[in-house]
From Swiss-Prot:
Predominant localisation class: cytoplasm
EC number: 2.1.1.177
UniProt key word Ribonucleoprotein: no
InterPro entries named in the record: Alpha/beta_knot_MTases, RlmH-like, tRNA_m1G_MTases_N
Pfam families: SPOUT_MTase
Enzyme class per UniProt: transferase
Keyword annotations of the record: Cytoplasm, Methyltransferase, rRNA processing, S-adenosyl-L-methionine, Transferase
Protein name: Ribosomal RNA large subunit methyltransferase H
GO cellular component, one term: cytoplasm
Reactions listed under catalytic activity: pseudouridine(1915) in 23S rRNA + S-adenosyl-L-methionine = N(3)-methylpseudouridine(1915) in 23S rRNA + S-adenosyl-L-homocysteine + H(+)
Gene: rlmH
Protein's organism: Petrotoga mobilis (strain DSM 10674 / SJ95)
Length: 155
């Protein structure tokens, strides 16, 4: 199963609506679980490195028996066809394992997580909020499934 694990709740109504819609469309092909982890305290009172390390500890429990893809603007970029090939190859070679897409919180990722990730993927060189990253990732996973099932993707 594929999981999207994100620090911080999805709050914006238009993002929530989009996420629900893509999860509904994707359900035709596969089940994707969205896991929203709570924020690690007050951003204004906690030093960034401690905050990020707390986020890392929340992610860490999902690492065993999983292929962990870290979303980060410094990761590898690919077009939708290459992403579909990567996703298909990863699902095939990771039988019985979860594929985790890890979306960081407001301060980004702890340095510790980069060594634990199996792959680092960039949605763009630009930085997105965690909400937009989740929505963009879901759109791409829907597109991937359309590509892998030889279906067109047009509106």
């Amino acid at each position: 199963m594929t999981r999207i694990i994100v620090v911080g709740p999805l709050k914006s109504p238009y993002i929530i609506d989009g996420v629900k819609q893509y999860l509904k469309w994707i359900k035709k092909f596969e089940r994707i679980e969205l896991i929203q982890l709570p924020l690690s305290g007050d951003l204004n009172k906690t030093p960034p490195s401690i905050y990020k390390d707390k986020d890392f500890k929340k992610f860490e429990k999902y690492f065993p028996d999983s292929f962990n893809v870290l979303l980060d603007e410094r990761g590898e970029q690919m077009d939708s066809v290459k992403f579909s090939e990567f996703y298909d190859r990863t699902k095939t070679s990771s039988q019985g394992k979860h594929i985790n897409f890890i979306v960081g919180g407001p301060l980004g990722h702890s340095d510790k997580i980069y060594n634990k990730a199996d792959y680092i993927l960039s949605l763009s060189k630009m930085t997105f909020t965690h909400e937009f990253a989740v929505l963009i990732l879901l759109e791409q996973l829907f597109r991937v499934n359309k590509i892998l099932h030889n279906e067109t993707y047009h509106y």
